[in-house]
């Protein structure tokens, strides 16, 4: 045993002593209760103290931005990307620029040569009526056995271009090509009546010549009246009516022969 004691005392020389453990005490019955335990020189009795509310710092809501205060923005009304509903969308004909009221007024202006023309309406670029009248004119020629659609469209394009250049030289305000095509197309309506007569009767006699001359004067007078009303060309109706008569005279020759 003396050898074992010597080995035990010489193994791992340290200052630790078993007798020192009895000196450490745990106070379970003191005034601090279970929260006043002292262990390894640390005092945990301070954790249960009461802190007054006025001494606590208020916490601010995190806004996602560093060192920037929270800004209050007024509520905004959401703006719709498209129309709120299909009921509030404009009709398809209005989006295409087709107004049947204006088409009817222009048609009545052509059918009544002595009626005053509304310059604001006639200055619009409306090609729905002229296209319909050109198709109707070609259809009546087809009923008479004359397939002249190419001549009708070609002469119409050349005539509109010539009148466009002439009116821009004569007027102070100028005119668009669409307006010229619209007016000349609407004034083609009496020529449809002439081609309709050619389906039933022959226009190569004296009666046909008089009727053809009347239709040419009707078309040219209506077109010149509309042009001087829309472009404020007072006193120049005869100068405008002459080239219009030449253009409608070509359509009359197609209808007669």
Swiss-Prot record:
Gene Ontology CC terms, in alphabetical order: COPII-coated ER to Golgi transport vesicle; endoplasmic reticulum exit site; endoplasmic reticulum membrane; Golgi apparatus; nuclear outer membrane-endoplasmic reticulum membrane network; nucleoplasm
List all topological domains (Cytoplasmic).
Answer: 1-124, 168-173, 218-236
Record Pfam families? Yip1
List localization entries.
Golgi apparatus, cis-Golgi network membrane; Cytoplasmic vesicle, COPII-coated vesicle; Endoplasmic reticulum membrane
Lumenal compartment spans: 146, 195-196
> In terms of domain of life, where is this protein from?
Eukaryota
Per the record, membrane topology reads: Multi-pass membrane protein
| Positions of region (Interaction with Sec23) | 75-106
| InterPro entries to which the protein is assigned, alphabetical | Yip1/4-like (IPR045231), Yip1_dom (IPR006977)
Q: In which tissues is it expressed?
A: Ubiquitously expressed.
Q: Where are the transmembrane segments?
A: 125-145, 147-167, 174-194, 197-217, 237-257
What GO terms describe the biological role, i.e. biological process, of this protein?
Answer: endoplasmic reticulum to Golgi vesicle-mediated transport; Golgi organization; insulin processing; protein transport; regulation of ER to Golgi vesicle-mediated transport
Family from the record:
Belongs to the YIP1 family.
Described function: Plays a role in transport between endoplasmic reticulum and Golgi. In pancreatic beta cells, required to transport proinsulin from endoplasmic reticulum into the Golgi.
Q: How does it assemble?
A: Interacts with the COPII coat components Sec23 (SEC23A and/or SEC23B) and Sec24 (SEC24A and/or SEC24B). Interacts with YIF1A. May interact with RAB1A. Interacts with YIPF3 and YIPF4.
Q: What is this protein called?
A: Protein YIPF5
User: Which organism encodes this protein?
Assistant: Mus musculus (Mouse)
Q: What is the phylogenetic placement of the source species in the record? A: Eukaryota, Metazoa, Chordata, Craniata, Vertebrata
